[in-house]
Amino acid sequence: MTRTVYLNGEYFLENEAKISIFDRGFLMADAVYEVTSVLDGKLIDFKGHANRLNRSLDELDMKNPISYEELLAVHRELVHLNNIDEGLVYLQISRGAPSDRDFVYPNPDETDPTIVLFTQNKPGLANSPSAKKGVKIISIDDERWGRRDIKTCLLYTSPSPRDQ
């Protein structure tokens, strides 16, 4: 089954949705995301996710391209169109696609953010052994900043100081 996805204000079949190769989410991981669980066809704690999304966007000085009411409607429509009973809605907002790659943040009046939402069907999510009994976890050191020798696309710390 081909899913319906949401991209920049429009619904597309997933194989028809296209994003610029210059999108900063793709080139620099300059984006925020949220994942909202769906159980029994209903969004779980949508308000909490929307609040965290707004806080994340504010912290990165990114503009929010969609209102709370519109975002809720899009989530509900995607759940409906894709017949999601148990699963999730993934949302990502990037700083957009300026005309070229640059560390300097694009002018938000000249470059619109890119907003993408899609669903994933996860049947049995609520009744999985992990959901019922929990999972074991371990903690490990975060080595991201100690491994600057690896050229990853996560360049958040590169653009930030330039805009100070």
Which positions does each model-derived feature cover?
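Helix-start/capping segments and mature chain N-termini
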Residues: 1-77, 106-158
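Acidic pyrophosphate-coordinating catalytic loop
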Residues: 80, 98-109
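A short, hydrophobic C-terminal helix/tail in secreted or cell-surface proteins
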Residues: 159-164
